[in-house]
Amino acid sequence: MTSTLQVEAEAFIQVVRTADGLVRNLDLLLKRHKLTFTQYNALRILRGAGGAGASGRDVADRMINAQPDVTRLLDRLEKRGLIRRCRADQDRRFVKAWITPSGLEMLAGLDKPVTDLHRQQFAALTKEELAQLKVALEKAGP
């Protein structure tokens, strides 16, 4: 009989292996567009923020993976013309970012390929199994 600790360790290893494989496939897709997973995530966050934009702190708080240097991440996206940033008049330390039309166009071009990839990655699971997986991972997560 497998002990609970062994089952937990096996579950952990399987989650990490699966996540690594899923992200690796997405990385390959994004690489064709000269984007990293982290940059893609930041662009999606800014698209979701809409006209209100988001501060660097807001972006950091919403990232899927912890990103220690959001400022540098946003610098790279701004240099490529995918986002724009502006300092607040009242407090020059406060910087807000918005996605640009070029950034929106890039994401729009990725929406279908990313959705198709996710469908392919989870094709072996039914909708019900996917919903159960999501709930189980939320229970186990931070």
Q: Which stretches of residues belong to each language-model region?
A:
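N-terminal leader segment of winged-helix/HTH proteins
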Residues: M1-H33, R80
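Pre-recognition alpha-helix immediately N-terminal to the DNA-recognition helix
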Residues: E10, Q14, N25, N41-I45, ...
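Short amphipathic alpha-helical segments with heptad-repeat character
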Residues: F12, V16, D20, I64, ...
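Short, locally clustered residues in the helix-turn-helix/winged-helix DNA-binding domain
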Residues: V16, R44-G51, D111, E138
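N-terminal helix-turn-helix DNA-binding core of bacterial DNA-binding proteins
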Residues: R24-A66
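Charged, amphipathic alpha-helical coiled-coil/dimerization segments
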Residues: D75-E138
